[in-house]
Amino acid sequence: MEDTPPSLSCSDCQRHFPSLPELSRHRELLHPSPNQDSEEADSIPRPYRCQQCGRGYRHPGSLVNHRRTHETGLFPCTTCGKDFSNPMALKSHMRTHAPEGRRRHRPPRPKEATPHLQGETVSTDSWGQRLGSSEGWENQTKHTEETPDCESVPDPRAASGTWEDLPTRQREGLASHPGPEDGADGWGPSTNSARAPPLPIPASSLLSNLEQYLAESVVNFTGGQEPTQSPPAEEERRYKCSQCGKTYKHAGSLTNHRQSHTLGIYPCAICFKEFSNLMALKNHSRLHAQYRPYHCPHCPRVFRLPRELLEHQQSHEGERQEPRWEEKGMPTTNGHTDESSQDQLPSAQMLNGSAELSTSGELEDSGLEEYRPFRCGDCGRTYRHAGSLINHRKSHQTGVYPCSLCSKQLFNAAALKNHVRAHHRPRQGVGENGQPSVPPAPLLLAETTHKEEEDPTTTLDHRPYKCSECGRAYRHRGSLVNHRHSHRTGEYQCSLCPRKYPNLMALRNHVRVHCKAARRSADIGAEGAPSHLKVELPPDPVEAEAAPHTDQDHVCKHEEEATDITPAADKTAAHICSICGLLFEDAESLERHGLTHGAGEKENSRTETTMSPPRAFACRDCGKSYRHSGSLINHRQTHQTGDFSCGACAKHFHTMAAMKNHLRRHSRRRSRRHRKRAGGASGGREAKLLAAESWTRELEDNEGLESPQDPSGESPHGAEGNLESDGDCLQAESEGDKCGLERDETHFQGDKESGGTGEGLERKDASLLDNLDIPGEEGGGTHFCDSLTGVDEDQKPATGQPNSSSHSANAVTGWQAGAAHTCSDCGHSFPHATGLLSHRPCHPPGIYQCSLCPKEFDSLPALRSHFQNHRPGEATSAQPFLCCLCGMIFPGRAGYRLHRRQAHSSSGMTEGSEEEGEEEGVAEAAPARSPPLQLSEAELLNQLQREVEALDSAGYGHICGCCGQTYDDLGSLERHHQSQSSGTTADKAPSPLGVAGDAMEMVVDSVLEDIVNSVSGEGGDAKSQEGAGTPLGDSLCIQGGESLLEAQPRPFRCNQCGKTYRHGGSLVNHRKIHQTGDFLCPVCSRCYPNLAAYRNHLRNHPRCKGSEPQVGPIPEAAGSSELQVGPIPEGGSNKPQHMAEEGPGQAEVEKLQEELKVEPLEEVARVKEEVWEETTVKGEEIEPRLETAEKGCQTEASSERPFSCEVCGRSYKHAGSLINHRQSHQTGHFGCQACSKGFSNLMSLKNHRRIHADPRRFRCSECGKAFRLRKQLASHQRVHMERRGGGGTRKATREDRPFRCGQCGRTYRHAGSLLNHRRSHETGQYSCPTCPKTYSNRMALKDHQRLHSENRRRRAGRSRRTAVRCALCGRSFPGRGSLERHLREHEETEREPANGQGGLDGTAASEANLTGSQGLETQLGGAEPVPHLEDGVPRPGERSQSPIRAASSEAPEPLSWGAGKAGGWPVGGGLGNHSGGWVPQFLTRSEEPEDSVHRSPCHAGDCQLNGPTLSHMDSWDNRDNSSQLQPGSHSSCSQCGKTYCQSGSLLNHNTNKTDRHYCLLCSKEFLNPVATKSHSHNHIDAQTFACPDCGKAFESHQELASHLQAHARGHSQVPAQMEEARDPKAGTGEDQVVLPGQGKAQEAPSETPRGPGESVERARGGQAVTSMAAEDKERPFRCTQCGRSYRHAGSLLNHQKAHTTGLYPCSLCPKLLPNLLSLKNHSRTHTDPKRHCCSICGKAFRTAARLEGHGRVHAPREGPFTCPHCPRHFRRRISFVQHQQQHQEEWTVAGSGAPVAPVTGRGDLPLPPPPTPTTPLLDPSPQWPADLSFSL
């Protein structure tokens, strides 16, 4: 800054600026001239100052933004990789990557030294000096006092009392407009005229439509021009910001300013850019509004506001002699381009709106005073004509009136009328002789423009209209009227919502928010006119365009009459004649009166055809040109990318075309509902179709005569209807298709999308073709009245002839005199058109967005009408030429013609023929036919090449238009076509084309080839020759003839639904929808209902394409022959090149086709089973085949996947797939708005949103549960199948889970799960980008990153009460149901014979897992049982005795709770986890005959000896191994005798029993093991690390471990009395110690070997340890502190947190935790949302288990424990004991384990007394059950 030249420094504050515009802006803001109008405060406070450089800012967001410039470092660009030194430089650089349409085009700031700004920056004398040389405003207007007649102006004193006593001369001026000279000179300072123009001159201007309405609004104009003396600044700016001190004149400005202080993170919903305050976000959102209608006539720059255009044009002041920009046009009143103004330079007077259109509808050409007898009773305003008064009265009809052509909300009928007028401005038309007919500009406008060109600086800052309350001045009177609303304070309530506002302006701004909702609402008719028919009804805007030579007065008058169909806000408005203004009480009277205006209309209503217009509508992005604006609209939607969300179902789309296609599906459902209500009467259907045809013709022609239909009938509707067909061209080519598609688009939206509704489409097409019998008058100007009343064709107005005003009388007469008006949607008939208009809002319209501006419309005709206001773009010279037959793209016309002659034999076609016309029209602008447009895939290709800079020099991909295949080079595509054309021999099917030409024959060949490919999967030359059988020919329904392309441009018709297509490839693609069945993907096991869905699946999952070839109902997708249908011969390849050479004959092809067409469900199931059996291989073979598939995909990617990602190198067949994939590289923080979950890229967010948005269509027929995807339903239905069949019919687990990990042996059902799992083996240094934590593998990092999102999910096994774990393999499950299904898998595996395992069955494996790998995740289902090892030697099997028993042991020992032993007896009976938490145990298989002998006394309610131990096992029935059930026997409950077919059912039954469970420390009794475990933590948290032998306490478990090892060396065994402590920490042993406070949900057991490779066997404990060699192989990650090993590095990292001991306080509560893992688990109690709410009391809980426990509170009976002293009942023992203490009875609970007196409970069963210290906890005699499973 210090090096800036002193010439650019501010003279007041000495600040330096890099450019003169910034200095000028600085002086305007901080150092304004003291006499400048709208004077700012002397100094604007800048309270936010940078601490490093001292720079000050007014807003905190500016300071935050500025501070980024001081952050030094290395900031790389994620798009191009360029590095920057600070974030601000990176932010500025990122704008260069933004799409061109979103960049802000800022006009250059006006320089201070230029003379044209002196009116703004240099103070002039006053407003009086501007208006006159020596007079003020009062003196200038003094002359109006002389006229005594006050009817010429409204009574000023009757309005608001703020008018001064205006002189007579001013009244004269208000009564009559000045002449041209006075009008021009009266504004300049050089004249001495004493007259000032009272109103701006009526001419074309850029005055906004809202200002036009406000000029005539209900707020009376109360004296605009005030004296120049403005009130002091402190009085003007009454509203002061309390934070920064900035003052404002209006409360709304202060409210807007306060948004800059709302600091936070505000992301943009379109580009996800984040901002620090709301104001910055609001300003940024304007960048996405791409609406820049103001074009500079000298250069190609466009601007958003007229002010910007004014400032920019001042730079061209010295360049007037240069040729102006010919391609652009003048902005018109509505802000769009006006071709009629091309020859006129927009003057400042035109741009600033000083020439205003009179809303009364006439021009006052003289200054003579006229009689004004018509006075408004509400405001006193007078008019000369009754029609003007009628028009004015509409301004008092307040309400919400939405415009049907744009998103504007208007507040009275007059405003709507004035606004609609802007959409129907006359544009440059075609006269009778073909010459452009431009309406002559009025002399007044020409002279005014000439005067201002001479002195351009006179009116730049002329603001004669000043507010008397705040002093603010405006250029336009309408702006002042609009501003005065802000001073109308009070309480204004919105009529659409309960919000209230302090002034009228705030209310009106708020109402705009309801724009979209009000437009789409069904009850909008109660508040305004039907939104989608307001502008389509009047014929006179079209008439005004057809009569460009009429007088301007007539144009204005006719526009007024055209929009004079009063939109009734309350449905009680009077009926007004739009011609003479008379009012009638009912519609019948108005109808009779309208007949009087109908004379003399027929002479002026002849129709004549017009010349075919040139292709004047060119796409600015790709240069493609069209004849009609609607075609360009459809095309532009393919370039509109972003995040478009559906308001109905919250789905998101990335192109506007995709969203619009989706929205039609919602409209289709609504249309079907209305048609069902209408009934099936034939008469109603005929009336419906006739009305629809009439509506379609009128809506099509009412768009305007500037783009009439060609002879070919090309229309935007046809283009719209074809947009969604992939591979189809975008324009219709016949009148029949046009009408059918138009009607389908307008009134039966969505029906054309459904393949099953083709019959209705055919019926609609036939009906419309019968009704539309006008072969030569497609371009005629049919009016709406004609279509409704049956006006003869000879009454239609001529296109090039001026029409008199009497035609509107005939139009209105015809409209009112119609016999019956029928709704095209529901068939209801109405006697009058007004009834139909009122009824139309009952059918919600669609949504159509303009591709050039953000406006939306309710109907396609409205969009077409709006689009005329946009100037069509110019065709670029480098436009590619696309061949519609094969998809090849050529850079020049010569190459395209050569290709057409050589490849398609189209030498006989003329240049003006159908196919040639498209490209010829680009340069010659006069084609004779309307050709097909580009394929949708080619459009995506063009867009992709513009986005990716690396593809600038690359050639276009070549797409075959018949089969859809894409080729990198032209040679490949030519060879592809040669292989097709070589099959045109005598042995191919007889073509019904006749002599249509070789081009059509080749299309048919391609179609036949693709059909055979889709049936047999082995397409090629042979198939194109052999596959053309009779069924295939019939299915195509190809129409023949010499001129096939001209007479029937859509020859390919589906014989099932009747839908027609231009290209055979489109029909082939469509027919896959009808090939239904269960199409099962062999790789990912997903099932699809039809071939089209399966093909889409293959497109998105490239790994599936390289899988094993399939048979049965799994056909391959056309054009992508990776998967084949039908058996593959040996040696066959799955590549398309080899498929062409080998395949079945003609009979086999037809047979396969018939099988695909009609295949019974039984056959489908049989073939499906065969496929499953054939594709199921052994687990060892799957990994090589996966690798082979990957290599095959990579090989094919080089030839058939031309679209590769430049970031990761992944390739795709279609450009759209690549665009979709590239979203995965758009990294950042993307939050879900529904659940606030965060994602790192857009693709993840998009996939996640489907969870919330997608409907759950697939419902289970047995339980009613619904799912989003079919595969989810299939997975769910397996549960029902297993329960019904007992698992006997299911195949081995390995077949269900064919994907095995080569490193750890884990198996998965889906390949994606295996890929996801492999990340856990990718070790390295992975750091979290959010926090400084590092992880050793990618899976651990991914799991960790979930913690940073707001919605933290608990992972399985981490939950305290809800997660359950399998004791056999250690896998965790979220609930008992999942565990039961998992246990059945173990059960089935155990029933199979142990092949090669030496007799070791599942029981031994289960117990081995209990010993060696308890709690760890092992391979599920397909894993081999791990044999139990003792001293490194496998033990073949010990079925009669548990293998975990030692040789000298007499009692079996499960894993003790402390993982140690005390005196040879296990301390606890549950599974020990690492933290010492209690893991209750459940019996998995309690299958036993009813007569089996119970050797253990632990049964029912009298388990007394082993009570404290076995009560935790939840009805654990100990029995002999000999009493085990054989496979096939039933399981019976030992308590109630109930039998079950499966052990899981018995497990669920036993879990629900109210058995007693005791705490080992205090002998408290509980009803379930979960409560017991929860209670045990209270003891753990309250005690320290104490030695059970000597009682010495230690600070950490390491010290205790060392101390216990010292005890072990001194004693050969631990005395049996040690178990008296009943301390869960009392686990002893040299090699394993588990201490309290180390977490509660670990995935590994507490058993710890002494050291790596050391095998320890305790003499008295009899515990066998698996060999460390095998353990090291399976568990390579070992903890260095305690020696525990894990399979995954993430598990080890998670475990190591348990060693970080100390006091870790919770930040949300005063609780202290002993280690990080406990703190992490505890923090979930605060952060996890409480999703489970009680339906009775509303209390919320984190888990379903807690809600279930809470539900017992509301149960009728509280529990089995009844207090003998009071009637209370208790469900839990602890509650009962605590209650007893209140009664001071003799039973108390001793904390040291004192016995509790028995209390009589439910059933009078005595409670077992707690064990005494001298009683051993376990009887050494009973045997352990054969198969155990533990769960939480």
Curated annotation (Swiss-Prot):
One of its GO terms (cellular component) is nucleus. Residues 26-47, 94-200, 313-346, 660-810, 901-931, 1103-1148, 1274-1294, 1377-1481, 1509-1529, 1606-1672, 1781-1832 are annotated as: Disordered. Residues 912-922 have a biased composition (Acidic residues). The modification Phosphoserine is found at S612. Residues 798-810, 1406-1417 have a biased composition (Polar residues). It is found in: Nucleus. One of its GO terms (molecular function) is RNA polymerase II cis-regulatory region sequence-specific DNA binding. It holds the Pfam family zf-C2H2. There is a cross-link at K451, K534, K557, K688, K1157, K1168, K1178 (Glycyl lysine isopeptide (Lys-Gly) (interchain with G-Cter in SUMO2)). Keywords: DNA-binding, Isopeptide bond, Metal-binding, Nucleus, Phosphoprotein, Repeat, Transcription, Transcription regulation, Ubl conjugation, Zinc, Zinc-finger. May be involved in transcriptional regulation. Belongs to the krueppel C2H2-type zinc-finger protein family. GO terms for biological process: regulation of DNA-templated transcription. This is Zinc finger protein 646. Residues 1460-1475 have a biased composition (Gly residues). Residues 94-108, 661-678 have a biased composition (Basic residues). InterPro entries: Znf_C2H2_sf, Znf_C2H2_type. SUPFAM superfamilies: beta-beta-alpha zinc fingers. Residues 313-329, 735-767, 1378-1393, 1427-1438 have a biased composition (Basic and acidic residues).
